[in-house]
């Protein structure tokens, strides 16, 4: 799962984790316009919501950096911000989530489009998981790349960040790469046939 936020007292850590490519053996990543655009859009969403909540950004790395996870690498920007005295965690979560990675931008239009065209219930996919006391502490994650285990099937849920610069075949390959990490966990134990 991707960190949505980690709250300790009046300090919150969050991140932009957007922009994906295949993991490289040499760690020599070159990020394209599409991945940088995707990362920037998600970052602006986070920063706008910090500002709306009257939060004070204490720390933000100057440029996104690369992190590796499973078969892929992502662009990441970290934020630490101080909450105001009248900060409402529940209200902030509702403005921060769904993130552009989950619902697109503008969020309301993106969610309407997903509801009209996606064709299935996401259940826990893209939901929020974690722990909080809704006052001083919270450690919450966006449930991306998850699986649902049924009696005779396993459904793996992954997605891709689609922008106007996206190439459909590249997005499809990204989802295959993301699913391979989860497949490697279960495939040695369970015979699997893959349906696309």
Language-model-detected regions and their locations in the chain:
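Contiguous alpha-helical scaffold segments within structured protein domains
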Residues: 13-116, 187-190
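Conserved hydrophobic core element of enzyme catalytic domains
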Residues: 2-3, 78-196
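An anion-binding catalytic pocket shared by soluble metabolic enzymes
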Residues: 1-41, 136-159
């Amino acid at each position: 799962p991707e960190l949505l936020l980690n709250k300790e007292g009046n300090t919150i850590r969050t991140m932009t984790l957007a922009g994906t490519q295949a993991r490289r053996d040499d760690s020599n990543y070159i990020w394209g316009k599409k991945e940088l655009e995707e990362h920037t859009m998600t970052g602006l969403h986070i920063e706008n919501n910090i500002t709306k909540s009257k939060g004070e950004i204490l720390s933000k790395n100057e440029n996104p950096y690369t992190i590796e996870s499973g078969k892929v690498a992502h662009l990441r920007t970290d934020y630490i911000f101080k909450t105001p005295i009248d900060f409402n965690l529940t209200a902030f979560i509702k403005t921060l989530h769904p993130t552009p990675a989950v619902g697109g931008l503008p969020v309301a239009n993106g969610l309407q489009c997903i509801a009209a065209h996606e064709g299935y219930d996401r259940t826990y996919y893209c939901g929020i998981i974690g722990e909080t006391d809704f006052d001083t502490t919270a450690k919450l994650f966006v449930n991306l790349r998850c699986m649902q285990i049924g009696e005779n099937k396993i459904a793996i849920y992954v997605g891709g960040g689609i922008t106007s610069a996206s190439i459909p075949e590249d997005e499809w390959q990204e989802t295959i790469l993301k699913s391979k990490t989860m497949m490697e966990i279960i495939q040695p134990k369970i015979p699997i046939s893959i349906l696309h």
